[in-house]
Swiss-Prot record:
PANTHER family according to UniProt: ENGB-TYPE G DOMAIN-CONTAINING PROTEIN (PTHR11649:SF13), MSS1/TRME-RELATED GTP-BINDING PROTEIN (PTHR11649)
Positions that bind GTP: 30-37, 57-61, 75-78, 142-145, 174-176
Cofactor requirement: Mg(2+)
Domain EngB-type G span(s) in chain numbering: 22-193
Name of the protein in its database record: Probable GTP-binding protein EngB
A GO cellular component entry from the record: cytosol
Pfam families named among the record's database cross-references: MMR_HSR1
Family: Belongs to the TRAFAC class TrmE-Era-EngA-EngB-Septin-like GTPase superfamily. EngB GTPase family.
Binding site for Mg(2+): S37, T59
Function noted in UniProt: Necessary for normal cell division and for the maintenance of normal septation.
Length: 193
């Protein structure tokens, strides 16, 4: 996929902060430090469109990115980070719930999980939440380059089992380091638009 435009548009916590609903949106969700920013940067072939951090909990708002004037990526705060206050976590949860349940141009959600580990309880809750609201889900298993080839099938099966993965959704092993999964991710995203 040729990327000729990838721009940060705005951040928001309430609907009045969201950009005008002119482009279909795809949200990116996952645990803190699962690789959401690296995923975005790899897809758009930029090093720092979405800021990466070794410190979990960096994303605290909904961040909107215009990609090729065709789709808006919406990076949501990571969940499961223990060093954020309970009040702040609850506020993020309400912000994300409002976005996921009211944004009519939301076409799907990319749920990122770490392929090296079974999904956390928070990952399962998020997947169940998205399915409950009948949102299309693309599960992207990040950090593929961190496991041996022989472990891939076992890890994929464990993730699908733990999530009770719906076969109508898409599952993509992905590496921000090697680029494996980039084409499959774009194909899945465009199928949802």
């Amino acid at each position: 996929m040729k990327i000729y435009k990838a721009d940060f548009i705005t951040s928001g916590v309430n609907p009045e902060h969201y950009p005008e609903p002119l482009l279909p949106e795809v949200a990116l969700a996952g645990r803190s430090n699962v690789g959401k920013s690296s995923f975005i940067n790899k897809l758009v072939q930029r090093k720092a469109l979405a800021r990466t951090s070794s410190k979990p909990g960096k994303t605290q708002t909904l961040n909107f990115f215009n990609i090729n004037d065709e789709v808006m990526f919406v990076d949501v705060p990571g969940y499961g980070y223990a060093k954020v206050s309970k009040t702040e976590r609850e506020a993020w949860g309400k912000m994300m719930e409002k976005y996921f349940t009211t944004r009519e141009i939301l076409k799907g959600v990319v749920l990122l999980v770490d392929i090296r580990h079974e999904p956390s309880a928070d990952d399962v809750i998020m997947y169940d939440f998205l399915k409950y609201y009948d949102l299309s889900v693309i599960v992207v298993a990040t950090k593929l380059d961190k496991i041996k080839r022989g472990q891939r099938d076992k890890q994929i099966a464990a993730i699908k089992r733990k999530l009770q993965f719906d076969g109508q959704d898409t599952f993509i092993p992905f590496s921000s380091e090697t680029g494996e999964g980039v084409d499959a991710a774009w194909e899945a995203i465009y199928r949802h638009l």
